[in-house]
Regions:
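Glycine-rich phosphate-binding loop signature in dinucleotide/nucleotide-binding domains
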Residues: 2, 101-103, 155-159
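Helix-loop "lid/cap" segments that line or gate small-molecule binding pockets
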Residues: 29-30, 50-63, 119, 151-152
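Substrate-recognition "cap/lid" segment bordering the active-site pocket of phosphatases
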Residues: 114-160
Length: 169
């Protein structure tokens, strides 16, 4: 029997290897705006945080440029970037074991919820989750402090564990 009944999984870097598609989408947005590319070698700087924050902090864009960068990013990501995604080896077995033990599972990602839905479907694990929880276009849910309570509400649970890639020191 599992210690926990509810599990929240991050998507990028936890369930799926998505760094290349995210980087390509980010590079495309920056180049499309005629801006110089920052050093994107450290993917932990831009995989995980909300997109608006990435454009502000990594690219040093102002508010208007950041909003436009997010639009361009999402257009590219929707047609190309999300396809450059693969399930980490063994994660499907882990999800199946948890599900078979009676646990409730949710994706809890700062990625736009529609993309999280589509990606879990593309990866063949969508049906293993009781809820797919992601950010909104209007910014009402954009980071983990907004998303975790939303996921807990969707699952109807209180005793849970959040599984994600390690945070940077």
């Amino acid at each position: 029997m599992n210690k926990y009944k509810y599990y929240l999984f991050d998507l990028d870097g936890t369930i799926s290897e998505s760094a290349l598609g995210i980087r390509e989408s980010l590079e495309n947005a920056i180049k499309s705006m005629g801006k110089p590319l920052p050093n994107l070698d450290d993917y932990t700087l831009y995989i995980g945080p909300p997109l608006l924050d990435t454009f502000r902090n990594i690219c040093r864009f102002n508010e208007e440029e950041s909003a436009r960068g997010v639009e361009i990013y999402r257009e590219y990501y929707n047609t190309k970037g999300k396809l450059v995604n693969k399930l980490y080896d063994g994660i499907d077995r882990v999800l199946a074991e948890l599900k078979n033990s009676g646990a409730k599972l949710a994706v809890c990602s700062s990625k736009y919820e529609k993309f999280a839905e589509e990606i879990t479907d593309l990866l063949g694990v969508h049906d293993m989750f009781d809820a797919i929880c992601g950010s909104t276009l209007d910014g009402s849910r954009k980071d983990k402090k907004d998303l975790i309570p939303y996921a807990v509400e969707r699952l109807g649970g209180l005793s849970l564990i959040h599984i994600s890639e390690p945070t940077r020191p």
